[in-house]
Amino acid sequence: MKTLLFATSLVLAALPAFAQQNCDKPRDDFDGLYCLNKVYIETDAELNQAYKDLAPRLQAEGRARLKETQLAWIEERNAACSRRIDSGFYVNLSCATRSTRKRLEFLQERARECRSAGCQPSKL
C-alpha cells in the first residue's frame, strides 16, 4: 500500500511538468484545448488582480465607472467570443484570451496613469 501511494504521488508530481511539456508542442486538439484554457485562466487572474489594484486608487465616481465599464466589457467579450447552440455552447478561447489581454493592458495603463498624472475617470 505504501509503495502504491508513493508511486501515485510520483505520477501526480510529474503531471505539471508533463502538462507544460504538452503546451510547448500539443499532441492533439485536447492538449491544445488544455493549454489554451490554462493561458486564459492565467490571463483572467492577472486581469482580476489589475482590477483590484486599480479600484482603490479611484474616487467613488471612478470606481462606479470602472465597475460599469468592466461589466460592459464582459458582455462584449462574451458576445464576441462565445455562443450557444442546440447541443451546448461554444467558447473561442483564443478570442477570449486576446480580449482579456487587451482589457488587462487597458487597466494596467489606467493604473500607471493614476500613479503618474492622477486618475482620470473619463478614460475608464
Write out the residue ranges for each language-model feature.
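Positively charged n-region of N-terminal signal peptides that target proteins for export
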Residues: 1-4
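Short, linear, compositionally biased motifs with a strong N-terminal bias
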Residues: 10-11
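N-terminal signal peptide c-region/cleavage motif recognized by signal peptidases
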Residues: 14-16
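N-terminal alpha-helical modules
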Residues: 18-124
